[in-house]
Amino acid sequence: MAENSVGANERNRLRRRSFLTRAGAVGVAGLAGCLSFDSATADGPAEELIEEGFATADIEPPFETTIAITQDQERNRVAQLLQSTLNGTDFFDVEIESRDFGSHIESMLSAADTEENAIFVSSWTGGWDPSNYVAMLFHSENQTPNGLNVGHYENETVDEYIDAGLTETDSDDRVEIYRNLQQELVADSPASFVRFREATHVWDGDVVSDWQTYPLQPGSYYAVYAPWAGVYTDLEDETEFVGDLGSDVSNYDPVKINGTVSSQATALVYEQLVGVDFDGEVQPMLATDWEQRDATTYRFSLREGVQFHNGEKLTATHVKRSFQRYEGTTRESDVYDWYESSTIIDDHTIEINCKREYGPFETALFNVAIVPLAAIDGELDLQEEPIGTGPYRFVEHESGNHWRLRRFDDHWFTGDEAVPATAPIETITLEIITEQSSRQAALERGDLHFSYNLPSASLADFERDDAYGVGRRVSGGFDMILYPCYLPPFSEPSVRRGCNMLIPRERILENVYHEIGQVAYTPISPLLEDYAGESFQQEIADEYVRPN
């Protein structure tokens, strides 16, 4: 998105926009008079906004539409609450359609092209940088099918903020940009942000000790052994750890991985120049240290003696060619949105040149796996055998059954006061179990040592049972309702805004998720506290979401 970035003067203009003041925003108190239809009359500020939008779009209520969800009990209950709320206004006649996960994703990607009349209940997992929560979903360049802007939402100011946030490197200025961006999104409401999710981990307390909960789901199994983060897990009288995956592993190759489960499965196989630890701090991994040489150039010193699982020894050439390998792939934007070139100084020193100043540079490196030259040259297919430098190496994948790794005894880590030189767990077996209830039953039978994202209603029981350990922390995920901005009446901001005000967030959190998570009004997770603290959330809610 380099061509859409704004210059310094424009960024300053964006930063100077006062917080919680938006020119042209539809204010709740600003509606005068009462528009009416034969079939519906507005009751309260939210419905007045909807009524205004219906009149502008020349839509006679009730408007028939569908809430599209995946086949999931919790999602179905959310949809039922939303259906009841919208139908209760008499402006909508809503039905619910559930689809298997694959069909749901396909319909989202094609919705705008087919002008599908549907509201999508979905979720998103961000990361350690605020751009992860907004760019793919709301930048006009990222409209489906090539991006994930499902509603084909367009807002020039939103685009400017997203681009400015990426090029800004001053931390305070980035906070202001992303807060203003979130304000703009809530005011325009291309989506309703409903709940910040929690990372919830449950383990057999008689077997697993010292488990730590990583807040982002792709890193669920870093707790097994992540010496770069100062973390490891031991087992009581066992050497095989048995966990689970919520679906099958579809891709092994880093340049093809586009799903959370594939990332979970390969997280201990591949490594990057740096890692982001359990507290969000950037830590050395394959790089021992680095320095910024100028605004767009960084020099990295590589760890010596690092061996790939196929016997290759890590050099700067591996790093340069691993970056180049992303070009022309489905993960190209992970690198080539900011990467310009690399210069090899010597075998263990490399300079990385960015196209422009890039705010999330260090966290972006955590997305770029370093792979062996055999894979880059085509002698090795990582889709058949994933090979990296990680503490565990691939053993087998029995599709629909399990994924298995074994300890890599030639891993580079030599031990320190916090983490032993050798991972205590020899074998990791991840059973592929798609149903939440089946995963819970397997854990209770003792077939699993660990599971994640179990039904919310069950967590309280596990927390009361001394036989289990439970880890809960706010994650990088949020639940949302995506509106078809390409289709009247949802093309009208006032309709979307009115619907956003009506979402029964507290009831959803309490009745569906049993208080697991937090009510959300904005997209950026409280995991990034500076960008989404509680007081900021409340200011946004009071100004734009709460009807009174």
What are these regions (language model features)?
Residues A2-L14, F19-S36, E74-S84, I105-F241, ...:
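Detector for C-terminal structural segments
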Residues S39, F63-Q73, T169-A187, T315-S322, ...:
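Alpha-helical secondary-structure segments
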Residues Q80-N87, G102-N117, G311, S437-L448, ...:
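Short helices/loops that flank or line small-molecule/ion binding pockets
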Residues T288-E332, P489:
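Aromatic- and charge-enriched surface segment that lines or borders ligand/interaction sites
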